[in-house]
């Protein structure tokens, strides 16, 4: 009888381990909506700033995908249809959550590049649970100037902040050092 119990315990232990392993291996899925530009400088709508804003989504997807997150694509036409105007999805977590939930994402990030000055801008984002529309965190990352390297650094910082609220698996790349020769 003792041997039967030992075998049963081993079997239950193996099943538990398998179920636990499946839970650990499940990827956290996140949808990242297109970032919108809130340019309140004296010369809004500069093509370079529009291009920079458009590049943020792809950079952030690359950082999070490299860390092991599953990136879910939301149909652009569906995103435009759900967006009632500038700032609508950013201010309506429930609508953004429903949009990403239909695409199969666990979470959605709604982002904005807020540019109050030519000297700096703020990368802003709302991380939302798609199953209930609950706001997990509101992020703000400052970036100086419009240089692509500085924008990427801000995106890396944003990815790190998002990851701290989710799986804590992201490791940002080390800073690039340049050697000065005499």
Tell what function each PLM region has.
Residues 45-47, 123-126:
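Short, glycine/charged-enriched secondary-structure capping and boundary segments
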Residues 2-12:
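Bacterial N-terminal signal peptides that target proteins for export
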Residues 51-57:
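Well-ordered, non-membrane alpha-helical segments in soluble/globular domains
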Residues 26-40, 58-59, 63-70, 98-102, ...:
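C-terminal/domain-edge helix-coil "capping" segments
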Residues 41-51, 83-87:
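Second-shell loop/turn segments in exported
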Residues 20-22:
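N-terminal signal peptide c-region/cleavage motif recognized by signal peptidases
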Residues 67-110:
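Short, solvent-exposed, polar/charged sequence segments at loop or secondary-structure edges
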